Amino acid sequence: VRSGMTILIFVGLAVLIVLLGAITYVRYGQPLAEDDFAARANDACIAMRGSGSGVDLTRAPTRGALERARNARLEALSEIRALDQPERGAEPVARFLSAFGETNASILRLESAIGSGGKVAPARRSLLRDVRDERELAAEASIPACGGLAIG
């Protein structure tokens, strides 16, 4: 009877240890994945910022400068998408990526307006609004370095 009780206690302790380990992993393991994603995405965007392909929207940009900025953004976007995105916190990242696409579309509209002699001022204002929204969503997704990438 005594050895049966000892075995039962050891089995109970083993189950308790496994449960505590699982709870600890779920509670603390996932944020590490989120932090790793955010750190790697921020690093990719910081590297792009250092490439000098930014556009200053306080002045009238050239089509070439906009194209270089768009290409740098697309390169950063492909690096971000190649990262393993955590399941938790995926919604803010998805909203940021959507805003990133909207900003890229605004860059194209501004390029077209410059090339066709169209209405540049409204296209520039639209781009500035999209960049502001993108920066807010990047901060919410814990990747602030990616907000407004290549657009000053």
Give the residues covered by each predicted segment.
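Transmembrane signal-anchor/signal-peptide helices with a preference for the extracytoplasmic
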Residues: 19-36
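Short, low-complexity patches enriched in S/T/P/G
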Residues: 1-7
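Intrinsically disordered, low-complexity regions enriched in small/polar residues
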Residues: 12, 27-30, 98, 102
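Alpha-helical segments in soluble extracytoplasmic regions
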Residues: 34-152
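Hydrophobic membrane-insertion alpha-helices, especially the h-region
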Residues: 7-23
